[in-house]
From Swiss-Prot:
Region G1, annotated ranges: 19-26
HAMAP family noted in UniProt: EF_Tu_B (MF_00118_B)
Subunit structure of this chain's protein: Monomer.
Protein name as it appears in the record: Elongation factor Tu
Residue ranges of the region described as G4: 136-139
Lineage: Bacteria, Bacillati, Mycoplasmatota, Mollicutes, Acholeplasmatales
Amino acid sequence: MANEKFIRNKTHLNVGTIGHVDHGKTTLTAAITQVLSARGLAKSRAYDQIDNAPEERERGITIKTSHVEYETEKRHYAHVDCPGHADYVKNMITGAAQMDAAILVVSGADSVMPQTREHILLARQVGVPKIVVFLNKCDLSPDEQILELVEMEVRELLSQYDFPGDDIPVIRGSALKALEGDAHYVAQVNKLIETLDTYIEDPVREVDKPFLMPVEDVFTITGRGTVVTGRVERGQVKAGDEVEIVGLKETRKTIVTAVEMFKKDLEFAQAGDNVGALLRGINREDVQRGQVLAKPGSVKPHSKFIAQVYVLTKEEGGRHTAFFSQYRPQFYFRTTDITGVVELQGDVKMVMPGDNAELVVTLNNPIAIEEGTKFSIREGGKTVGAGSVSKLLN
């Protein structure tokens, strides 16, 4: 039997729950599905179904993640919840689950905790555009003044990391009580869902962003010219478009004279398509794997940047020992490995397997990167870490 068709009649949004361990992220995820299933918009998922997350691999790293989907009258949501703190760090840094928005869950009974801070910082560094706060376990802390203080503390923390702390919606509730059917708390979960629909704008679809395609392979078609193949990362391209070849060498302009998919001419290619693009006046040796084709002026080559990285543990197949400044691994961006030198930041003297660290990286060759670009760190073809560019330095 054919798989059920995905009906695209609503805007799709990716969200995730973040926050300190045991503050109620998974319980809230279960409560959202239960409340929406009562309106016929979701399948109710029990706590242990979500908590029993399957393992996935992204950029050579194993991550436990639960994916839950639900709809509102306005949107279709894909919601990601991770069981362990390390899974969150890995998930956000590798971009395994790109979030258009995050629901920060803070226990009203415990207030801000270390991972609350760490998850907000990560959300800032990997470019999560919007955060909504759910103050959970308010049934355990009925004192209004205490809840006011907790809310104030959360808002201050968000402002500290450049989120609009004063304007972010904070919804008070109890995920557990909502699951038990308490009418007041069910209404608060409904209020959270309504807030997701109204406070978070529709994301700009990848198709509408400026064209970019990493070059995977290059070959010559006799009598026609040079063809580069790859998967369109974002935007669209059609015959007659001017593009730039960016990275590794001097940036060059050319015209795309044809776009093909599975040996058939395409009117245009868009984000997600695997295509071949025929380039005018370009020799085979002018372009190579690791470069990108991009809309002119949309992306520049860079070789020095600040990155947020997660270093794999020995058990995850990573290094057995720490590394220091002047460490020289390969950085795998999109389709290629480039050697680079690492400098540790601040008073950090070494980075241990399992650490989440900020590094300055200088690559041997400039390549097309932007803030938010993801990469793997490799040694001899083996993944030892994953990172995200947080700031360009040249």
